[in-house]
């Protein structure tokens, strides 16, 4: 069964299939797909395409190949592809900020420079209470996953500077994982506890965990209110690798660790 990442009804069916034991897989767009997509946009004007991070997928290479072919076809149009080095709602947050700049009338060159300067500063902090999909993807070993499940251990992960997933620790239970995520935000967010920038949270079929994470952030950061924090579903593509019960926190801060 084929699921589209942005189909809410399909997302519900997707998680239902996972609960029944289905093992989803993903595929990426080819160069021709990108050419068709980007060419339709070029008909309307110059294009700045912010691609999903190369640390997670090679699709940015296909986008760059398509862009090169289209630039040769029409050198009068400007088409730029940027490797965001971001993923999931961190990627969405970067694009959201770029769109804000565009809507304020900033030039394409200004937006491009801002994205390049800030993409490595969007922190991706996440954890999971279900280790089976991380075992399948090689993030944790089979033995570690079994022991972790027995001991109720949550792996703590983040994206590094290049946008690759790094498992840097573990904690026992969801409450401690939430506490660690907030502590990381406190240490790395712009202005520390005075942070007042954007904050996104996403989850894979665990809305209660997302709400608990949001409440912990609001308690720790007085300038952020519950309504300021955007909570999103993890789409089918990312959830094919994380499985259910993953929650993630995104915020702007210093450079992510290399």
Region locations from a protein language model:
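Mixed-charge interfacial surface used for oligomerization/domain docking
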Residues: 1, 48, 55-59, 63-68, ...
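N-terminal glycine-rich anion-binding loop in soluble enzyme alpha/beta folds
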Residues: 1-33
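Short coil/turn segments at secondary-structure boundaries
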Residues: 21-29, 51-58, 85-86
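Short, charged beta->alpha transition segments
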Residues: 31-40, 65-67
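Glycine-rich phosphate-binding loop signature in dinucleotide/nucleotide-binding domains
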Residues: 41-45
């Amino acid at each position: 069964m084929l699921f589209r990442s942005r189909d809410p009804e399909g997302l519900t069916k997707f998680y239902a299939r996972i609960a029944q034991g289905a093992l989803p897989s993903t595929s990426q767009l080819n160069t021709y797909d990108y050419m068709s997509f980007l060419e339709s946009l070029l008909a309307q004007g110059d294009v700045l395409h912010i691609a999903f991070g190369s640390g997670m997928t090679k699709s940015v290479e296909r986008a760059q190949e398509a862009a090169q072919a289209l630039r040769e076809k029409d050198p009068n149009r400007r088409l730029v592809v940027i490797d965001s080095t971001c993923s999931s709602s961190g990627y969405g947050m970067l694009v959201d900020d770029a769109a804000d700049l565009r809507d304020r009338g900033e030039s394409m060159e200004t937006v491009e420079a801002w994205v390049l300067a800030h993409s490595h500063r969007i922190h991706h902090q996440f954890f999971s209470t279900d280790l089976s999909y991380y075992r399948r993807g090689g993030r944790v070993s089979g033995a570690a996953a079994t022991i972790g499940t027995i001991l109720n251990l949550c792996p703590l992960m983040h994206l590094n500077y290049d946008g690759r997933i790094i498992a840097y620790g573990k904690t026992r239970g969801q409450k401690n994982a939430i506490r660690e995520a907030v502590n990381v935000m406190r240490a790395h967010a712009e202005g520390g506890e005075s942070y007042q920038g954007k904050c996104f949270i996403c989850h894979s079929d665990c809305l209660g965990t997302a709400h608990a994470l949001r409440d912990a952030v609001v308690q720790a950061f007085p300038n952020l209110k519950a309504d300021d924090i955007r909570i999103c579903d993890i789409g089918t593509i990312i959830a094919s690798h994380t499985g259910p019960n993953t929650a993630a926190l995104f915020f702007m801060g210093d450079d992510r660790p290399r």
